[in-house]
UniProtKB/Swiss-Prot annotation:
Belongs to the class I-like SAM-binding methyltransferase superfamily. rRNA adenine N(6)-methyltransferase family. RsmA subfamily. Pfam families: RrnaAD. Its EC number is 2.1.1.182. InterPro entries: KsgA/Erm, rRNA_Ade_diMease-like_C, rRNA_Ade_Mease_Trfase_CS, rRNA_Ade_methylase_Trfase_N, rRNA_adenine_dimethylase, SAM-dependent_MTases_sf. The gene is rsmA. PROSITE patterns: RRNA_A_DIMETH (PS01131), SAM_RNA_A_N6_MT (PS51689). GO terms for cellular component: cytosol. The keyword Secreted does not apply. This is Ribosomal RNA small subunit methyltransferase A. It comes from Francisella philomiragia subsp. philomiragia (strain ATCC 25017 / CCUG 19701 / FSC 153 / O#319-036). It is an enzyme of class 2 (transferase).
Amino acid sequence: MQYKTKAKKSLGQNFLQDENIIRKIVQLANIKKDDIVLEIGPGLGALTRYILKCSDNVNVVEFDASVIDTLLQNCQKYGEPKVFNEDFLKFDLDIVRADSQQKLKLIGNLPYNISSPILFKVIEQSDKIIDAHFMLQKEVVERIISQPNSKTYGRLSVILQYHFDCSMILNIPPEVFYPQPKVDSAILRLKPKANKLVINDYIFFENIVKQSFAQRRKTLHNNLKGILKELDIDPNTLPVDTKLRAENLSMEDFVSLVNFLK
């Protein structure tokens, strides 16, 4: 592997350089020959090389044009990925699906400074993917997989768990990166739920969840009183106890609440 390119702090770049960890990540992604794979932020191609060994259809979206030559050089012995020098947040997944209805496998060492926007983009496209394996700050992964009544349980937990089965499948120490980040990392697996709960108004669901967690120490009654007043709804008639805080409600509770309100 060549590491000629200096990592850019502004893009949240930290390049993987431990071959054992790299192999393990790709192995856990369980990529098959006929899978269409889309890697987000391949950087210098650490993961890409091993993905090319597994699949005949490897696509990468890389925002930083300055790393692409090195990426392709590092991949030479393994094959050639199709490179899109674009911002993933504006990228159309249907481009790599071509005319097929085949779903994609997503993988990537995500830039930590924009991981949340990327995750929300993946939510929007969840019907087009088989699964996703992302390296993220461990603290973020812990928030995503958190359960109710936990300090780390929040908006991201509820929204992602509505769409996906979420699990942390590998811990990754800072020393396997160049440059070393100041935090631990982890691999998050997202698998779209086969039977999602029905929501009458999904945008309203997102708004209710966001508003409920707006001030964590406040009760649902205080956080939602403006919305309840606007809808002319008596808090005592709701299917959840408004004296509770948002962190006490399960994802299913939020769905029940939203379907009652709309």
